[in-house]
Swiss-Prot record:
Its EC number is 2.5.1.78. This is 6,7-dimethyl-8-ribityllumazine synthase. Belongs to the DMRL synthase family. The gene is ribH. Pfam families: DMRL_synthase (PF00885).
């Protein structure tokens, strides 16, 4: 039996990060964690491009444009959608997750879902670098592993 998995070495890999400005007090921390994860694993700063979008709903469109360019080994989507008192949360969360998955499948480029979908601000803060670690860092690890796995499958 042969098994295949991606490594966490980022040398010579290119990454795009698409980040929502909405809830920036959370997303800025996710970005810090993401950049830390990539740089700790030998990704050169010159191989990281960061694209800001207004809100989480806009993330899939920019991811699609970047994936179609074939310039990146993986794309990381970062955002924070926090439940309010209207059904808006459900609509945005569902469309963002579906949109990101569709881009990845259609373009055959890993698009990593680093969008927090939380019931409270406290939950989001916990996932952006306090009690529950930093999900931006976790997204970077997934991007590294998937970029290398896809590279291995292609060769």
């Amino acid at each position: 039996m042969r098994t295949f998995e991606g490594s966490f070495c980022g040398k010579d890999l290119k990454f795009a990060i698409v980040i929502s400005r909405f809830n920036s007090f959370i997303t800025d921390e996710l970005l810090k964690g993401c950049l830390d994860g990539l740089k700790r694993h030998e990704v050169d700063s010159e191989n990281i491009d960061v694209y800001y979008v207004p809100g989480a709903f806009e993330i899939p469109l920019v991811c699609k444009k970047l994936a179609k360019s074939k310039k990146y080994n993986a794309i990381i989507a970062l955002g924070a959608v926090i439940r309010g008192s209207t059904p808006h949360f459900e609509y945005v969360s569902a469309e963002v997750s579906k949109g990101i998955a569709n881009v990845s499948l259609e373009q055959e480029v890993p698009v990593i879902f680093g969008v927090l979908t939380c019931d409270t601000v406290d939950q989001a803060i916990e996932r952006a670098g306090t009690k529950a670690g930093n999900k931006g860092f976790d997204a970077a690890m997934s991007a590294l592993e998937m970029a290398n796995l896809m590279k291995n499958i292609s060769s």
